[in-house]
Curated annotation (Swiss-Prot):
GO CC terms of this entry: cytosol
Keyword annotations from UniProtKB, A to Z: Amino-acid biosynthesis, Aromatic amino acid biosynthesis, Lyase, Tryptophan biosynthesis
The species this protein was found in: Bacillus subtilis subsp. natto
Cysteines joined through disulfide linkages: none
Quaternary assembly: Tetramer of two alpha and two beta chains.
Family: Belongs to the TrpA family.
Role played: The alpha subunit is responsible for the aldol cleavage of indoleglycerol phosphate to indole and glyceraldehyde 3-phosphate.
SUPFAM superfamilies recorded: Ribulose-phoshate binding barrel
Active site residues per record: 43, 54
Designated name of the protein: Tryptophan synthase alpha chain
Enzyme Commission number(s): 4.2.1.20
Length: 267
């Protein structure tokens, strides 16, 4: 299980990529680039054919990965390959619950341990149904990451009391995707979560530029960035796949990712 021990001036930068997008070997290089860009941890998404929480950018990434033959087992194994190839930040598997159910639970957790996967995030599993999975995570030393969206304070307290690693604070209702601005009600909500939580609070769903990062960093411990990075991968995909242009495209991706991280001011 991992703990994110932050220095007072340090902020979380937790990027999301889809395992196998655009191709598995490039996913490994993208993870290394994100680590160099200052990522605190990595969310590794499992491609799924019916991604309820995801907007069009991540849906297209899922399709590209599924076209490569990716599934939950291969995604976990890809996480293991990342660890073997120099990725030493925590890797959190982001998966819908159905692919987990289709595997034997014992086999699923054995795979996570064998491949040194540090955390698990299941976006479509409500609090009431997550207790047994949280217990399994504890017994296998995998950190279960809790998602919180605007809800009653008593429910918030219940979710946050059980939180480990960090609390993933959902900035907008609806699906993932780049947003130009957020509803003003999100800011008091994030402050409430921050006041209740004893673990770091990261804000995600829609973070797409440096200005939003600065704003969210003022009231939280950092950000989760998904669609903006996945869209950049989509834009660079042909150059990432080609051996001749890959290094240059990876550098471009790393420079882009750095704008979301604490390393930005060091450039």
């Amino acid at each position: 299980m991992f703990k994110l021990d932050l220095q007072p001036t340090e902020k979380l930068f937790i990027p999301f990529i889809t395992a196998g997008d655009p191709v598995p070997e490039v996913s490994i290089e993208l993870a290394k680039s994100l680590q160099k860009a200052g990522a605190t941890a990595l969310e590794l998404g499992v491609a799924y054919s019916d991604p309820l929480a995801d907007g069009p950018v991540i849906q297209r990434a899922s399709k590209r990965a599924l076209d490569q033959g990716m599934n939950i087992v291969k995604a976990i194994e890809l996480g293991g390959e990342m660890k073997k190839n120099g990725v030493n930040i925590p890797i959190i598997l982001f998966t819908y619950y159905n692919p987990v159910l289709q595997l034997n639970k014992e086999y699923f957790f054995a795979l996570l341990q064998e491949n040194h996967i540090d955390g698990l995030l299941v976006p479509d599993l409500p609090l009431e149904e997550s207790n047994s999975l949280q217990e399994e995570c504890k017994s296998h030393e995998v950190t279960y990451i809790s998602l919180v969206a605007p809800t009653s304070e008593s429910r918030l307290k219940t979710i946050i009391e059980q939180a480990e690693g960090f609390v993933y604070c959902v900035s907008s209702l609806g699906v993932t995707g780049v947003r130009n601005e957020f509803n003003s009600s999100v800011y008091p909500f994030i402050r409430t979560v921050k006041n209740l939580s004893t673990v770091p609070v990261a804000v995600g769903f829609g973070i797409s530029n440096r200005e939003q990062v600065i704003k969210m960093n003022e009231i939280s411990d950092g950000v989760v960035v998904g669609s903006a990075l996945v869209r950049k991968i989509e834009e660079l995909k042909d150059r990432l796949i080609s051996a001749e242009t890959r290094n240059q495209a990876l550098q471009e991706f790393e420079d882009y990712a750095m704008a979301f991280s604490g390393l930005y001011s060091l450039k």
